[in-house]
């Protein structure tokens, strides 16, 4: 494969897409929720890959027609997702002034399959240059870049501000846009965003989590620490369906006997495998924590729709005590045989899953739980770790988020569903030890991106290979 570089990227055009109709005066000031206020002012990239059409006219005029429909549909969709076309006034209010979103058309001198095969090295070339360089949200809340490859394939990159949207809101926006575009391709009217009313946004998060006026002037940019970005690396791992199924089956009986738990989910199993590998890589005596982001909408009473706009994602933290973390390190644990070692590993994996599930099950939609969630956002990390300041330096903290079952592979713009949906991890000190999970096209495997320091990554890969041999 030829070496890819920025020279392979040619920006054809840039324009601003505004809502088709002006936002009504009474909706001009959109108040963010408290959870929005604590969210970072960074773009989250989402890239959807679509293969070339099978007909002979898959390039040229067809690309032009597709882009025209996409831009028209964006204009219509923004009428309903009007905060995305606005600008932030401060850390409390979005001025829904219809200034619009940025739209780039880019030609890629290369084949889409080459980018997919060498994704770790080349995905950043598919991002808008301003996102690839700094990633801070300055003006537009959304940037869309349509990357057209020589082979006729297309990769659409959506960069959406995490300040106003979590993954659930992002996919609702993308699927609404896809539905509108698909309707337009069939020659129907695009007077509505989609016939699926589940994709029409509602704006109820502010009433559930009222904003704090004290935070209005505080914008949460990514903070810097002593970690050098050069030492931070991001790698992609694929957990295939067969491995995940094998792990779920082996852990199921253990979890039922020990905890009376149901079969672990795909995400729980992969989380445990990553956690276990990271713990084995940590210094002896380290406390291990996993902070998992979870969609709060279905935990509410009554449950909220997926189309509820904004950040309705809360975090749960599971803490593995130092004694347990120490015993998983081969330098401090002796086993009498290979079979015993395998059984110990399976026991620990089931313990990890049960511990994480217990923390997730604690999250309810009642007022008391919501107040605890708010306190956690205000005061930071989990109290069970923070209360002992002497051990804070010995904490190995992982931060996990999952897009599994969010429906990204259902985004059909009329070209069929995407063959791959992925992100480009943020290589910033704040995102050290970040773990991101997403579905594979088959629906059963899981793609994982991890950010570790270079030395930690080497150890992590070694221990992960060892653990996966159990399944």
Curated annotation (Swiss-Prot):
EC supergroup of this enzyme: transferase
GO molecular function, one term: acyltransferase activity
EC number: 2.3.1.285
Catalysed reaction, written as an equation: (13S,14R)-1,13-dihydroxy-N-methylcanadine + acetyl-CoA = (13S,14R)-13-O-acetyl-1-hydroxy-N-methylcanadine + CoA
UniProt record, GO biological process: alkaloid metabolic process
Top-level taxon of the source organism: Eukaryota
Pathways involved: Alkaloid biosynthesis
Keyword hit for Oxidoreductase: no
Matching InterPro entries: CAT-like_dom_sf (IPR023213)
Keyword annotations: Acyltransferase, Alkaloid metabolism, Transferase
Classification via PANTHER family: F21J9.9
Similarity comment: family membership: Belongs to the plant acyltransferase family.
Role, per record: Acetyltransferase involved in the biosynthesis of the benzylisoquinoline alkaloid noscapine. Converts (13S,14R)-1,13-dihydroxy-N-methylcanadine to (13S,14R)-13-O-acetyl-1-hydroxy-N-methylcanadine.
Protein known as: (13S,14R)-1,13-dihydroxy-N-methylcanadine 13-O-acetyltransferase AT1
